[in-house]
Amino acid sequence: MFHEVILNVLKNPFIALFLTLSLGYLVGKIKYKTFVLGGISGSLIIGVIIGQLNITISPDIGSLFFALFIYAGGYQGGAQFFRSLNKDTLLLLASSTITCVLGLLCVLVFAWIFQLDKGTAAGLGAGGLTQSAMIGSANNAIAMINSVSESTIHTMQTNVTVGYAVCYIFGSFGPIILLATIFPLVMKWDLRKEAIKLATEQSDGNLDLEVGQFSAFSEYTTRAYKINRDSQLLGKSLVEVYKTYKYKVVIKNIIRDNKLLTITPETTINTNDIVAITFYADLDIQSIISKDIEVTKPEQFNFIEEKRSLILTNKNLFNKTIKEVKDIIQDRNYYGVFLQKIIRSGQKLPISDDLKLRRGDEIRLIGKPEDLDKISNKIGTFISEAPITDFIFFGLGMVLGYIFGLISFNIFGISITLGAGVDCLLSGLIFGWIRSIKPQFSNLPVGASNFIRDLGLAIFVASVGITAGPQAITTIKEHGLTLFFLGIGVTIIPQVISFYISYYLLKIKNPIVLLATIAGGRSVNPGFAALLERAGNATPVIPFTSSYALANIWLTLWGPVIVALVTIIPK
């Protein structure tokens, strides 16, 4: 009875999914030396096992969570993707084409050696290369054969489905192991370190820090000094200090006679004052306070600073240099703020006095809230730093993604669609790019996008395993292991050859770029998910997107090509 209760509980698709998720990531922690199975591989294995209970998972569940996963991944890489479209992208497309062509040749060679019929060969290609669209294109090509009976056409179309089912499991699982474990192990790559390194290069040297890490160096520092009678600061007002040292030194607080003063721009500095000075870390502060004595921070110095981002909308500041802007907005008042960075179209600009500002530039300032309040309305629109999701644009992004999925076009009479992956991926890229150039719109905080991405891929892989589990065992029993092992060959051989061609001949040397390109050329979503998990950031998105889009077209076209070139027809 207890056994029946457990079975009935597991029949609930949501219980099965989340149990697969939990056990899969538990199994994924298995480690042997440098080999780590990983949560994605673990979820696929556990899903196949739990799938033996014939649990029905609606395909819409997997599709929805995959759409969420791929949208979040695209969003995170959107800004960098559109900036990276250059001649180097041609190498990625060449690698993708090589992978696809090698896959086709592998299928044709196996079909010739093992005397496979048109349908089985097409199924071998669809499953081993994990391209379900190939089923449709192959079936359409088979239906157009006029020289055979309808029953033979039906048999060949059935063989397409059977071949796909037999080969699909390893077609999904194999790239996970190859891309996320075997290749990095052979090449002695640490994917997380390589991803951080690549992200740093793409962000002009800004470190991609892991949770718990922080930079040991700060752009600004605050120290306390006691003013001597021969100090350079003695007798100066706070606004004079600010302007004398070109806005690089700010007096934040003053203690006089053991009392914290309420300071104004006109407040002057007296002998024996204890002042809190904030200054740029690269400033030679000793040349300014050489006559003064540094002291430990008094208890009265407990002021709070804030970082604030503004979009330049004040037309009086358009096309003005930074020096001119400083002179304009600091003309009569002491504000005590620092310019931290300027971002234009998603890219950080080097700050110099002669840099001209443009409408829509994002200006990031640092200072006390009351000082920032004074200056903000003279620059433009405030952008909230709160980690709040803009559900207006998130909803529009998903809608646009599904609309993209409805688009189809014909190549040589074959209907091609963007597919379940490219649609929301493309939408995510667009809305991530919008966020980079218009930061007041389309906010999806890093924490939220990471959660959507990770949960989406985990549920997607779990549903794939549960759904494919029963059919995989059944078809292997019915059709033997030959087709299964041929599928392994179709999955592994093109990837291995393409990997070395891309690395040594095409000179794609960056590990993350190379592995993501191979994943895209194989049109393998679980493999990309595993790579994304190991990378820990969005660096694989850009190369994957380029090669994935082209591979979808090539692999869909291979269906009719296989049907045309394989000559055997079942009796």
Swiss-Prot record:
Keywords: Cell membrane, Membrane, Transmembrane, Transmembrane helix, Transport. The chain crosses the membrane at residues 5-27, 34-56, 61-79, 92-114, 161-183, 391-408, 412-434, 455-474, 484-506, 513-532, 547-569. Pfam families: Asp-Al_Ex (PF06826), TrkA_C (PF02080). It is a multi-pass membrane protein. It is found in: Cell membrane. One of its GO terms (molecular function) is monoatomic cation transmembrane transporter activity. The keyword Glycosyltransferase does not apply. GO terms for cellular component: plasma membrane. One of its GO terms (biological process) is potassium ion transport. Belongs to the AAE transporter (TC 2.A.81) family. PANTHER family: K(+)_H(+) ANTIPORTER SUBUNIT KHTT, PTHR30445:SF9. This is Uncharacterized transporter FTT_0829c.
